[in-house]
Amino acid sequence: MCVIVAKYFEGTGWVGVKNRDRNYVPDLSFRKKQNKNTETLYFWDDITQYCEGMNDSGVCVLSASLMVLDDEKEITVRTKTPSKDGIKIKKALKLTDIKAVAMSLIKQKLPGCTLIFNQEDCYLLEGSWAPGGYEDKDYKYKIEKIERDQTVARTNHGVWLKWAGYQYGADDNESMSAISSRSRLLIAQHVVDSAETPAQLIDWLTKKYVDNWQLNAMRLADEKKMMRTTAQLMLVPKDLTMFVRPIQSNIKFNFWKLNGAKDNKMWVELLTNRVLHTGEDDPAIPTNLSHIED
């Protein structure tokens, strides 16, 4: 369960941010790979081998799950079988054209809410298996170009594909997840509409807007199997830079290997979590959240 947002900033272009939620504490790392026509930089979950990121043509991919059965599985050991979604994203990011990347994800039937963007353009893809099953049913999708005067936010329920993701009434646990997804979407949309800089965009997604942490865009948890935000990821195509803020995760990196080469094209920057403990310059609480905890 995650939050993704994107906004166009004058002078910077499109910027995408993701709050990545898991019900385990992941081991994270970064990987660069030289392909035939492009180089790719991935944010990598060492346990599941899920990945997302950018290429040196400035095309970026961030995704939030709509596959609720898979999303709720607790994964505690490393697997030799790579994440299917990660494989699809890796394959798509080998392409240099943003439309080709989007079409690759569609042809591979990537489920979820997915942002495909570069400095100039942004597309949102919602994809899911038709009601009734996973992968044995027809793949349905909708993709639209997001205009520069628009913003976009998604969590873990379908907005265009109404049946997809967490729904009310299936059972108590899924109903609670459905409430969380809709609360997080309201907060994320408020943040992306209010932010005037990329720094505000990522920082304001850490704030506590309602008392229950599970209803906030950033979720904290101490109990096992509870969803918690493990890291934030911000991709800035103009600068070919991946900003990462570890929150509840273990992260391993070699800055010299990532950023030290003379011909380096893409960059990794780590952000402090100090923002979690300060309240300076926070946006107002959205008025339409007053009923969420009732």
Which residues fall in each region the model found?
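N-terminal nucleophile
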Residues: 1-294
